[in-house]
Amino acid sequence: MERFPDYINVTMPSHFYPDDGKWIQEMLAKLRVSTRAKITGEYSEVYQAAWDEEPVSYRKDNAARRAANIRLREFVVEYQEAAQGYTAKPIAVNQP
């Protein structure tokens, strides 16, 4: 468990690229504690799956980082909007 500067405990995923550590902590700190645990597990799963799927050894790190980081970034953006009350505009239904 690592210490984030504002004294929030951020548990890091079991699989991640060390250079991404600070960014991952920043993203996870934006989430609720209950959500963080699930997302760190899923981050590790996506990272490991992308690592295993890449056949070229020197491309494994990049493929794994890219897949896991894109997923984390997209989730955090959508989660923050939902947590702040933003919703999509309802679909208009034609009334006869």
What are these regions (language model features)?
Residues 1-96:
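C-terminal alpha-helical interaction appendages
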